[in-house]
Amino acid sequence: MERLQKQPLTSPGSVSPSRDSSVPGSPSSIVAKMDNQVLGYKDLAAIPKDKAILDIERPDLMIYEPHFTYSLLEHVELPRSRERSLSPKSTSPPPSPEVWADSRSPGIISQASAPRTTGTPRTSLPHFHHPETSRPDSNIYKKPPIYKQRESVGGSPQTKHLIEDLIIESSKFPAAQPPDPNQPAKIETDYWPCPPSLAVVETEWRKRKASRRGAEEEEEEEDDDSGEEMKALRERQREELSKVTSNLGKMILKEEMEKSLPIRRKTRSLPDRTPFHTSLHQGTSKSSSLPAYGRTTLSRLQSTEFSPSGSETGSPGLQNGEGQRGRMDRGNSLPCVLEQKIYPYEMLVVTNKGRTKLPPGVDRMRLERHLSAEDFSRVFAMSPEEFGKLALWKRNELKKKASLF
C-alpha cells in the first residue's frame, strides 16, 4: 500500500511504471489501475486481448515510455491518439511534473494545462488524403446509380420503362452506342466487333462509283450546255481585240480573257496512252521508218540471253535489229531501245599495259555483245546460246582469257 501511496493518482485505464524498482523499466515494476483495482504485470497479461484495457484501438502499436503516461483527455480524441502512436517520438522537452499531475486527474483541467490543449492545439502534417465533404454530392460512392437518379427525378412508371428499354438497347451495341447508318455494317461476333466484310465494302464502293459516274455525266451535260456560252465569249473576245489598236493592249486583253475562261475537265475524249493498247508491230513499223543508225549488213543471231522468247529467232523479219525494241537485257528492267553496234574483235580487246580507247557507245561490262557471230564462235569456241547458259563466274573467266573483261 505504501508503494501505491507514493505513486500519483492515475486515470482509469492508464499504465504507470514504479520508481522503486531496482531495475527501472522492467516488466515486474509495471502496475495498472482499472475499475478501482490494482493489477500487476502478470494479471495484466492474463486479461484477454479482445477487452479494451487501455481504451486504445491498437495497443500493440503503442510505444512504452517509462516517464510519460497518457491521460483520459488524450484518449477521447481518437485521431490524435492514432497520430501519436503511429508518428515517431517528438523531440520537445517533457513538461513539468506539476502540469502532468494536474493533467492526469480525471475531469479537472488546471490553468497551466489549459493553454496547452486549447490555445496551441497540436497539429501534424497529414500524410493521407481527406475527401471533400463540404458538398453532399461530392462522394461518388454514396450516390445512387444513374438510372436510380432518374427514377428519383421523374418517378413515373412510364419514364422507368423507357430508361430500362434504353439500357437494354444500348447493351446490344459495342461501347453502348448505336452504329452509324451511313457506314457499312460490321461483322457481329461473340468476342469483338470485326470490320465489315469485303462483300459489303465492295457493294458500297460500287454504289459510290455509280453515284460519281452520274455526277460526272451531269457535269458533261453541263459542259455541253456551256459550249454555246464559250462560243459567245470567244466572239466577244474577237470583237474586243479588233477594237484595240496597240499590240500591248491586245496582249493584256488576251491574257485577261484567257484567265476568265472556265477550265474544262472533260478528259474522256483523250486517247489511251497506256502500253497495253500499243502493239509491238506498230512500234517496229515506226522504228523502221526512222533513219538507220549504225546498221550493218551483218546479221546477228538472236540468243535466249538477248531475247525474251524463242519465237523471235525463227522469224526473219526480227533479225538485224528490227525487233530490238522488244528485247530485254539480262539484269535490266528496261528494254534496250538502241541497237548495239558490232565491232571487230581487235577493237574490243582490253590490255593491262596501257589504257585502251574503246569505240564510243560500247558497253564495257558486255563487250562480247559487240562481236559478230563468226568472231564470237572463234573467240569463245561456242555459240552465244551456250555462252548465255553458263554461270556468271564462268563467263567472266572466259572473258578474262579473251581479254574482254
From Swiss-Prot:
GO cellular component terms listed in the entry, alphabetical order: actin cytoskeleton; actin filament; cell projection membrane; cortical cytoskeleton; cytoplasmic vesicle; cytosol; perinuclear region of cytoplasm; plasma membrane
Keywords: Actin capping, Actin-binding, Cell membrane, Cell projection, Cytoplasm, Cytoskeleton, Disulfide bond, Membrane, Phosphoprotein, Repeat, Tumor suppressor
Protein name from the UniProt record: Dematin
Effect of S333A: Reduces interaction with plasmodium berghei 14-3-3 protein. Inhibits phosphorylation and interaction with plasmodium berghei 14-3-3 protein
Modification Phosphoserine, positions: 16, 18, 26, 92, 96, 105, 110, 113, 156, 226, 269, 279, 289, 303, 315, 333, 372, 383, 403
UniProt record, GO biological process: actin cytoskeleton organization; actin filament bundle assembly; actin filament capping; cellular response to cAMP; cytoskeleton organization; endoplasmic reticulum tubular network organization; erythrocyte development; lamellipodium assembly
Function (record text): Membrane-cytoskeleton-associated protein with F-actin-binding activity that induces F-actin bundles formation and stabilization. Its F-actin-bundling activity is reversibly regulated upon its phosphorylation by the cAMP-dependent protein kinase A (PKA). Binds to the erythrocyte membrane glucose transporter-1 SLC2A1/GLUT1, and hence stabilizes and attaches the spectrin-actin network to the erythrocytic plasma membrane. Plays a role in maintaining the functional integrity of PKA-activated erythrocyte shape and the membrane mechanical properties.
The organism of origin for this protein: Homo sapiens
Biased composition (Polar residues): 108-123, 276-322
Encoding gene (name): DMTN
InterPro entries in the cross-refs: AbLIM_anchor (IPR032402), Actin-binding_LIM (IPR051618), Villin_headpiece (IPR003128), Villin_headpiece_dom_sf (IPR036886)
Source species, domain of life: Eukaryota
UniProt record similarity statement: Belongs to the villin/gelsolin family.
